[in-house]
Structure formats: structure tokens, C-alpha cells
Swiss-Prot record:
This is Large ribosomal subunit protein uL3. Belongs to the universal ribosomal protein uL3 family. One of its GO terms (cellular component) is cytosolic large ribosomal subunit. One of the primary rRNA binding proteins, it binds directly near the 3'-end of the 23S rRNA, where it nucleates assembly of the 50S subunit. It comes from Syntrophomonas wolfei subsp. wolfei (strain DSM 2245B / Goettingen).
């Protein structure tokens, strides 16, 4: 059975724990999901593929540029901060201006959550790549240094070598997370486990590609 594609945008509120029917503590991430507004429909005849363009999170009108204001005006909606496009099975199920709310997901659904990981700044090899430390004795000069960068022959460092650098701040997808609870009236979705990003970080929730 093929699962119908669905997605919604949200803001990470934080984490807490709830108790299930067996009185077992379950760690959950709280996401303020939607409401999202359909801004545009794309079809095979005009665009070569089917998708819907969706906006989320109110934006002051003065912060939207002129082309964006025209786009929102055409859809007859107020300016929105985040705009994403989702491939779906049938665009005819949606209308421009329609709201997508948290109740598209139900308890027990498996979802993939996409977000931007916390930025850690410049980090060394031990923290960034989980390298083993060198000897910590008094005579050692290689406590946390990277070690060899390659053989003498090429006389250069190959691309892709794991070296110190910026850690975090990257797009991360966590797959196969379980929806524990949905509160449609409060636009909240509780998902088991942790999700990428800091508090108030932007996330996208999609039904899991590994859902059976």
C-alpha cells in the first residue's frame, strides 16, 4: 500500500517528556506545526511536474520585497516568512489559499524531520570527526592534533580529508520518528526523540520514506 505524500512546516519549541499508557516516560520534541497556506499549484501541463508551494509563519509586510509582495497578493494571503515547495500525489486536492494544519498527521505515524543542526563554531578533529586522542603523557606533542595528512609523494592534501573546521549549521534529516500526540487546536505535534536544530528553529515534517 502506497502512503499518500504529505508535509508541513513548523517551529521547534523544545523537548519534554510524557507518560504512555504503561506509565513509561517517553522523551518528545514539541513542534508548532502550521498552519501553512497554499500559495501556488504547479501542474505537469505548465511546469512539467506536480507540486504545491506553501508558506508559513507571518512576516511583516515591510520585510517582504516587491516581487514577494506581488506573489502573496496574487494568492490573496498575508506575507509569510518561509516558502517551500512539496511534491504531492494530486494537486487537485488543494486550493490556493487553503490552510494545511497539524491534523494531517495522526498518532502513530512515522515521519522524517528536516532541520538545520546547531552551529558549534570552529572545532577540532576530536570533536568534529570523533578522532581518537593521542597520548596524554608529558612527552607527547600530539594530544588532540589531527596527525598525518597523507603520504610524502603527492605533496598535497587531498580534497575531502577530515580536518578541523566549522561544525554544525548543516541541513540534517532524521528518519523514522514516531508521532506520539497531535493537538490540532493548538497546532502542536509531539514527536518521539530529538530533532535537529535549536529552540525556535525551522523544521519540515514529512511522512517517512521508510514507512511500511
Amino acid at each position: 500500500m502506497t502512503t499518500k505524500k504529505k508535509a508541513i512546516m513548523g517551529i521547534k519549541i523544545g523537548m519534554t517528556q510524557i507518560f504512555d499508557e504503561n506509565d513509561k516516560a517517553v522523551p518528545v520534541s514539541i513542534i508548532e506545526a502550521g498552519p501553512c497556506t497554499v500559495l501556488q499549484k504547479k501542474k505537469v501541463e505548465s511546469d512539467g511536474y506536480e507540486s504545491i508551494q506553501v508558506g508559513f509563519y507571518n512576516l511583516k509586510e515591510k520585510l517582504a520585497n516587491k516581487p514577494a509582495r506581488g506573489h502573496f497578493k496574487k494568492a490573496n494571503v498575508k506575507p509569510l516568512r518561509y516558502i517551500k515547495e512539496f511534491r504531492i500525489d494530486n494537486v487537485d486536492d488543494y486550493d490556493v489559499g487553503q490552510e494545511i494544519t497539524a491534523d494531517i498527521f495522526t498518532t502513530g505515524d512515522l515521519v522524517d524531520v528536516i532541520g538545520t543542526s546547531k552551529g558549534k563554531g570552529f572545532a577540532g578533529g576530536v570533536k568534529r570527526h570523533n578522532f581518537a586522542r593521542g597520548s596524554m603523557g608529558h612527552g607527547s606533542k600530539y594530544h588532540r592534533r589531527p596527525g598525518s595528512l597523507g603520504a610524502k609523494g603527492p605533496a598535497r592534501v587531498f580534497k575531502g580529508r577530515k580536518l578541523p573546521g566549522r561544525l554544525g549549521g548543516e541541513r540534517v534529516t532524521v528518519q523514522g520518528l514516531k508521532v506520539v500526540k497531535v493537538y490540532p487546536d493548538r497546532n502542536l505535534i509531539l514527536i518521539k526523540g530529538s530533532i535537529p536544530g535549536p529552540k525556535r528553529g525551522f523544521v519540515i515534517i514529512k511522512n517517512s520514506v521508510k514507512e511500511k
